[in-house]
From Swiss-Prot:
<feature type="site" description="Interaction with auxin-responsive proteins">
    <location>
        <position position="155"/>
    </location>
</feature>
<feature type="domain" description="F-box">
    <location>
        <begin position="1"/>
        <end position="45"/>
    </location>
</feature>
<feature type="binding site">
    <location>
        <begin position="390"/>
        <end position="392"/>
    </location>
    <ligand>
        <name>1D-myo-inositol hexakisphosphate</name>
    </ligand>
</feature>
<dbReference type="GO" id="GO:0031146">
    <property type="term" value="P:SCF-dependent proteasomal ubiquitin-dependent protein catabolic process"/>
</dbReference>
<feature type="region of interest" description="Interaction with auxin-responsive proteins">
    <location>
        <begin position="453"/>
        <end position="454"/>
    </location>
</feature>
<keyword id="KW-0927">Auxin signaling pathway</keyword>
<keyword id="KW-0539">Nucleus</keyword>
<feature type="region of interest" description="Interaction with auxin-responsive proteins">
    <location>
        <begin position="394"/>
        <end position="398"/>
    </location>
</feature>
<comment type="subunit">
    <text>Part of a SCF (SKP1-cullin-F-box) protein ligase complex. May interact with auxin and auxin-responsive proteins.</text>
</comment>
<comment type="pathway">
    <text>Protein modification; protein ubiquitination.</text>
</comment>
<feature type="binding site">
    <location>
        <position position="498"/>
    </location>
    <ligand>
        <name>1D-myo-inositol hexakisphosphate</name>
    </ligand>
</feature>
<feature type="binding site">
    <location>
        <position position="69"/>
    </location>
    <ligand>
        <name>1D-myo-inositol hexakisphosphate</name>
    </ligand>
</feature>
<feature type="binding site">
    <location>
        <begin position="473"/>
        <end position="474"/>
    </location>
    <ligand>
        <name>1D-myo-inositol hexakisphosphate</name>
    </ligand>
</feature>
<keyword id="KW-0833">Ubl conjugation pathway</keyword>
<feature type="binding site">
    <location>
        <position position="425"/>
    </location>
    <ligand>
        <name>1D-myo-inositol hexakisphosphate</name>
    </ligand>
</feature>
<dbReference type="GO" id="GO:0005634">
    <property type="term" value="C:nucleus"/>
</dbReference>
<dbReference type="GO" id="GO:0016567">
    <property type="term" value="P:protein ubiquitination"/>
</dbReference>
Amino acid sequence: MVFFPEEVVEHILGFLASHRDRNAVSLVCREWYRVERLSRRSVLVRNCYAARPERVHARFPGLRSLSVKGRPRFVPAGWGAAARPWVAACVAACPGLEELRLKRMVVTDGCLKLLACSFPNLKSLVLVGCQGFSTDGLATVATNCRFMKELDLQESLVEDRDSRWLGCFPKPSTLLESLNFSCLTGEVNSPALEILVARSPNLRSLRLNRSVPLDVLARILCRRPRLVDLCTGSFVRGNIVGAYAGLFNSFQHCSLLKSLSGFWDATSLFIPVIAPVCKNLTCLNLSSAPMVRSAYLIEFICQCKKLQQLWVLDHIGDEGLKIVASSCIQLQELRVFPANANARASTVTEEGLVAISAGCNKLQSVLYFCQRMTNSALITVAKNCPRFTSFRLCVLDPGSADAVTGQPLDEGYGAIVQSCKGLRRLCLSGLLTDTVFLYIGMYAERLEMLSVAFAGDTDDGMTYVLNGCKNLKKLEIRDSPFGDSALLAGMHQYEAMRSLWLSSCNVTLGGCKSLAASMANLNIEVMNRAASINEADNANDAKKVKKLYIYRTVAGPRGDAPEFISTF
């Protein structure tokens, strides 16, 4: 057998960008494992409780970029996922840290202070869906991290104490390339923002919150016409009359703009103002513009011939989607959200989805909230778009059958998984029986994430999926009849999966205990409304579990579980 020198192996590994590929080569042999761990610069931890921070740093002593994911989407408030242990471990073992990305974690101001004071050379801080910190923490980061290129607060809950943090970035100029504070709910110091933009010549991505006035936006665009990504501010604040012409002129000079979002409180009046940038847009997010009439939306979208990603509200209607399908033939991702999240009705149906699939045959990803669906429509979509890697369909009435025949939607979803060989993410809704799970287990060979609700007849349905989907990583099931037999039937698969979420199913405490006794590398967390359960009390074994979260770990049971969680 021929062995490559370490330098050659390290050089080869340098061409592997994905975490999946790096993980795979580390399993080839001990020598490759050693070279890979010493040369790894970027690490992704998909579950903050899957491994201890100290162990991650011990394995990868040379890492420069760390990404950690926290709580799952469905867990109750107070579940955990504190960022402090991870930041403290970085301080102790990773002096060269340059990038930190945290998702759905609890980040305090003290945590941000520790981070900023310990890593003055930090270049990128991304906090997605995080909470627990305020603008005081942001001020500390801006003051101390003088080489910051990216600060992204996407969908985080930030306590607004004041807006002085915008004035804390280094003077006379910054290295900022990307700034996202669209999630902030408080007022923004407009003069400080304008000065910051003026001092950031490398700025290419800017996402403002809804308190930034229209006239300020116009001046920002005039100052930085080479933006590539923009989330606009408010369209109803500031000197609107005076800013209208200025904004139109500013957009005319934004020839590099590719991604546009925001449109906070925008009305149909302002759509023509944005028209100059239509021809170059590849990403357009209109999900925050409920007051723009569909006719104006359609007219605007039709001018975006290069569009690859489109997010809209369902008031665009089936007719609007048909026009989009004929105009945006390069479309690769479509998301249609309900304009009224509390409504059980929608203005889009299966007709809009079929039209999009017919006109946009490059479509790879769909998230579609609709009023009704049919098997024939899904079969047609499957034939038109075999490139799907992500297909998420939400029928607003979760138990809805085929709107024409009254049959379950099994055959339609079966066509999706059979035609779309590269499907990795699937979300189902509507009236579904065990048959759809049989199809998924038979045909969805590459499926990694599956989310279902109000589906199935017996334990067989879940068993079909666990036995058939060898690449499954995440399984989320809500309000379905699966019980202990289905749970225990998947033991062979759980070692390879990242997590399993079950809520309002038929699993009992006894089933959870049986699984825990057989699989020591799993954390099995039962979430109760009351205090923790006495594990030794067998009288509780027949009680159904309301919420269950199972995940693979090499760290053992966590020490910060709140009282409403019992770990087996």
